[in-house]
Each structure stands twice: as structure tokens, then as C-alpha cells.
């Protein structure tokens, strides 16, 4: 079972995701269709910036030509918004994530590359790419890169703290719960492309120690999912009950001197 499918099933079993609820997939493709079908999702719109689409590629699901960095979606139209390994193709992955958060009615689920000390070392050694050449080459050198163009995109890698700081900046009035899932994805396909057999063998041999470190320290894994539960948001204790402003009663409790007094 893939990490994607396993995470979906976990959240469905816990009642955090509803397979029957309207669901938007951002920067989606065939893998999303296959995985969501297997997980039992029924009301899905898969969106991307692929001008080659005619509209029925993801049937029985709908398709829409949508820019993930500027979602033309009424907030709440989709109960849940899902993205799998597509934000790093955006010009601004942060903007795309915040667009998903703005528009989702209940929750956002994202799967992306994770930054870590181990990943930075692997990048320096050339085990993992800084730019994604394979995706463009695999699409006839015309698509698959930055904003689905022929320009290879940088592989943006996230941290938990980065996600939390973004949400705190965008929605400061609320405490927003975020849950994380971790996975190790070994670069077998990339290693297979190495022309020199000795270098290829050396790369394969290096996977064992990296795998051991990642298993012992899960936050050194190179892929993670994060689930943003908008329904479980809590108003900050220093906000007015209606969420409109800072509470005067909180600020004037004696711990702080009210500058407006």
C-alpha cells in the first residue's frame, strides 16, 4: 500500500476525511485518480495546468484547468482539498498552500518533499536532485516542470515549522492543528538513470545507511504528509469571542499594561 493511500485510509477511519464529500485535488494527475478511487472517494474534481487535457482523462472524476496559486474557488465549495507532490512545481509553493487553506471548507491534506539534515547531505552528494529534470524529459521536453512548462522546477522541500509559521501568519486569530505523517521514498528510479555502473552501484550501496538513519529518526525521512484540520481550529485565548479583535479583558488582566488605558 502506498504512503498516499495509507494516509488517506487512516484519516477516513478516524472520520477526518469523508470519501463522499466534495473534494478538490490541486496539481493532480493519474496517480491521484487511481489512489482516490481505491480509497473510495466519489465526488472529486482533479485540477492542474495541463493544456493537453480534454476533460475526460480522470473519469468518473471531473477535471478543471486551475492554477493552484490562484484558486478560482468559492471558499467552502470543496470540503477537503488534497495535493500530492505538486506544490514544488509552483512558482510560489507557499501561496498555493495558503490558497488551499483559504478555500477548503474542512481540511487540507498535502504530501511533499521534506527538508532535513540528511536530505541536505544527500543533495550535496548528488543523491537527490536540486532541479527536476526527469519530469520535463519524461514529458517530451515540453511539460512537467515549473508551472507545467519545459523549464525544470526546483525541488522545494518543507519543514513542519515552516508550515506552522505560514498558517500562523495567514490565520493569526486561530490555533490551527496540523498533523504529520512520514515516509521514506528511496530514489531507485533516479539511480537507474546513472550511466556509470560503478557510480550506480555506489549510490545503491549508500541507500542502506540512509534508510537506517531515517527509520531511527523519522524526521530525517524525505517525504511527509501534513493534514490541516480547519474544523478543529480554536480561537486564540486573547481574541474577542466573535473573533473580531484583541480582547481588552485579556490584555488588561494585570500581566500586561494596557497602552490604551
Spans of features found by a protein language model:
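Conserved alpha-helix/loop element of class I SAM-dependent methyltransferases that forms part
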Residues: 1-21, 31-35
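Class I SAM-dependent methyltransferase SAM/SAH-binding core
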Residues: 22-70
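Short conserved loop adjoining the S-adenosyl-L-methionine
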Residues: 70-75, 91
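A conserved beta-strand element that flanks and buttresses the S-adenosyl-L-methionine
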Residues: 82
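A short glycine-rich, Lys/Arg-flanked "PGG" loop and its adjoining helix->strand segment in the class I
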Residues: 94-110
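Conserved class I S-adenosyl-L-methionine
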Residues: 106-141, 154
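Short alpha-helix
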Residues: 151-181
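A C-terminal cap/extension of S-adenosyl-L-methionine-dependent methyltransferases
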Residues: 176-261
Amino acid at each position: 500500500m502506498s504512503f498516499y493511500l495509507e494516509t488517506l485510509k487512516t484519516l477516513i477511519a478516524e472520520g477526518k476525511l469523508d470519501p463522499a464529500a466534495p473534494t478538490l485535488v490541486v496539481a493532480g494527475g493519474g496517480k491521484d485518480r487511481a489512489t482516490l478511487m481505491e480509497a473510495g472517494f466519489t465526488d472529486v474534481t482533479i485540477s492542474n495546468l495541463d493544456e493537453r487535457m480534454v476533460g475526460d482523462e480522470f473519469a468518473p472524476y471531473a477535471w478543471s484547468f486551475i492554477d493552484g496559486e490562484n484558486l478560482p474557488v468559492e471558499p467552502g465549495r470543496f470540503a477537503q482539498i488534497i495535493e500530492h507532490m505538486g506544490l514544488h512545481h509552483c512558482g510560489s509553493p507557499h501561496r498555493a498552500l495558503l490558497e488551499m487553506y483559504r478555500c477548503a471548507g474542512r481540511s487540507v491534506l498535502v504530501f511533499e518533499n521534506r527538508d532535513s539534515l540528511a536530505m541536505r547531505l544527500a543533495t550535496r552528494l548528488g543523491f537527490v536532485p536540486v532541479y527536476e529534470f526527469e519530469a520535463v524529459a519524461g514529458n517530451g521536453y515540453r511539460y512537467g516542470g515549473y508551472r507545467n512548462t519545459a523549464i525544470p522546477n526546483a525541488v522545494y522541500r518543507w519543514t513542519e515549522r515552516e508550515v506552522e509559521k505560514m498558517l500562523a501568519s495567514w490565520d493569526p486569530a486561530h490555533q490551527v492543528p496540523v498533523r504529520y505523517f512520514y515516509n521514506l521514498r528511496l530514489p531507485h528510479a533516479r539511480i537507474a538513470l546513472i550511466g556509470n555502473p560503478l557510480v550506480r552501484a555506489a549510490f545503491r550501496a549508500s541507500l542502506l545507511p540512509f534508510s537506517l538513519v531515517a527509520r531511527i529518526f523519522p524526521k530525517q525521512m524525505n517525504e511527509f504528509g501534513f493534514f490541516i484540520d480547519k474544523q478543529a481550529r480554536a480561537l486564540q485565548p486573547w481574541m474577542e469571542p466573535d473573533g473580531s479583535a484583541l480582547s481588552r479583558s485579556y490584555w488588561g488582566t494585570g500581566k500586561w499594561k494596557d497602552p490604551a488605558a
